Amino acid sequence: MDIDVIKDKIEYCLQILREKDQDLLDIEVNERTITHKLAEYIQDQFPNYDVDCEYNRYEKDTKRIRSIKNRSLDITKLKKYQIEKLIWEDKKALTIYPDIIIHKRKSPNNNLLIIEVKKSSNNKGEDFDIKKIEELMEPPYKYKFGLFLRIGIQNENNKCKWFPR
């Protein structure tokens, strides 16, 4: 699928989110609530794919990042962030839970898009989310595209940073 088609579909979903769920953005519910609603709209636009939130599997294994320390973001520093999504199982790898993914379950060659979301009111963990996107676009996961999405709260504009492979 072409990146421009994907961008148009995601933009449309963000418009629907604003139209139907502005109240959630106004009261600043947690990011998981927002990503769940957004994923519902994304699923409608990608009917031939599975759209999952907080999905931590790669085939039968747990989805992990092993080489992030070698990519200029020290894992020990990440522990200082209060990032709820991390499970520190050992010092060399960590279990990750991408906010939204568009993929085909049990088909690792069909990983289309990983989306990491932050509310505009949340400035913590952006560097980690971007590194997570970059890592998941590499083997073995090989997502074709990545998106870091800063959701505008209380009528602020959304900001999208796209990552092509």
Predicted regions and their residues:
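Mg2+/Mn2+-dependent nuclease catalytic core
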Residues: 120-138
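Active-site metal-binding core of divalent-cation-utilizing nuclease and nuclease-like domains
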Residues: 50-108
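Charged, often low-complexity linker/regulatory segments
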Residues: 1-43
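Nucleic-acid nuclease catalytic cores
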Residues: 138-164
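Conserved catalytic cores of phosphodiester-cleaving nucleases, focusing on short active-site segments
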Residues: 98-104, 111-121, 133
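Feature marks short, surface-exposed loop/turn motifs that line or immediately flank catalytic pockets
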Residues: 16, 57-59, 121
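A general structural signal for alpha-helical elements within enzymatic catalytic domains
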Residues: 43-47, 138
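Surface-exposed cleft-lining segments at the edges of enzyme active sites
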Residues: 21-27, 87, 117-121
